[in-house]
């Protein structure tokens, strides 16, 4: 049985580093070594390997990944890294000039020159698929390439493959850790695109990752490698049901149908368990209640917004390893009953659970959490405030206008983001009996 295919795009420095960590993780789970040769032990590993990998000759598997950047540095780092031999050499597409943290360069000038080259590679990968399911993109929203060129690619791919799913793993700017001054501009302009063109966006944020590393994993000085390791654990968890036989959410579209009640509200927060410091997990057995409690703990969410400030529209949990389905179902029911204030009551059964038999490497059981909560508006609100403060004074605007952008675009992006925040707020405040107010206008029965 031929399975579905995901073309994986990595744009910019952040996207490539996170993406490479992801490929490293899933290669290990499928029993592939650093050059893509299969040496695994179980048939399950091979069963749906073709979702993410193409089979080359002599038992070698190649990731269906396209690596994109506007400067060669990141590519060289990936190539010379431990898994550099895994990727197809033709799938590295890079410019020479860099985007200089400027969204306009990534979207309109430098990125636009490179985009056709990238689309050729994407087209070639898509044509080799028997039944293309969709695209998965890793990028950051704060820089120039991942945000500007990433969103350009998303809209171009949308034009060409309008009926395919588009999932993005987006690293959103964090409240205290800022890499560039113009982050709010880049992020707002990107959000403007993602709201329209992405089907689901998993929001990840560096500060939340730092907090997890320091608070839970007890690392005193976390490196980007540690952060990427966390993200790749979540990405691997989210894609488990695509890669291993299971019952629920077995493709991108099914997950989206279960998770997105209104098309614009497709920004998810993610969590993972068990998170223990590297030496500690051998000292205790992990139980399903513990996993559930940990993955739904606000401290372990990988986006800096606290779900207790909003309500869940929907959420999905993926358990991996030998867990009893009944135990999982009971546990999730308990969670929903205890925390009913944090779930909207007008979507019944809004928790989905999926189980897959194969655990991640080094763990007996694990769980991943994906939540569509109205609290995610905190992120947009925060970025929006920073955006307004700078835009009111027209600070740094010349960098964008000199690349041919119009102030109008900034205004549109700002109002689109404000609309998004108020939509989240509206559904947070809605209750099950709100429908009655419309019935006054109904004609009287004779």
Curated annotation (Swiss-Prot):
SUPFAM superfamilies: Tubulin C-terminal domain-like (SSF55307), Tubulin nucleotide-binding domain-like (SSF52490)
InterPro entries: Beta-tubulin_BS, Beta_tubulin, Tub_FtsZ_C, Tubulin, Tubulin/FtsZ-like_C, Tubulin/FtsZ_2-layer-sand-dom, Tubulin/FtsZ_GTPase_sf, Tubulin_C
UniProt feature, compositional bias: Acidic residues: 431-446
Database matches in PROSITE patterns: TUBULIN (PS00227), TUBULIN_B_AUTOREG (PS00228)
Gene this chain is encoded by: tub1
Start and end residues of each stretch annotated as Disordered: 421-446
Cofactor: Mg(2+)
A Gene Ontology cellular-component term: cytoplasm
Keyword GTP-binding: yes
Protein name: Tubulin beta-1 chain
Subcellular location: Cytoplasm, Cytoskeleton
GO terms for biological process, alphabetical: microtubule-based process
Similarity section: Belongs to the tubulin family.
Residues annotated for GTP binding in this entry: 13, 71, 140, 144-146, 206, 228
GO MF annotations, alphabetized: GTP binding; GTPase activity; metal ion binding; structural constituent of cytoskeleton
Binding site for Mg(2+): 71
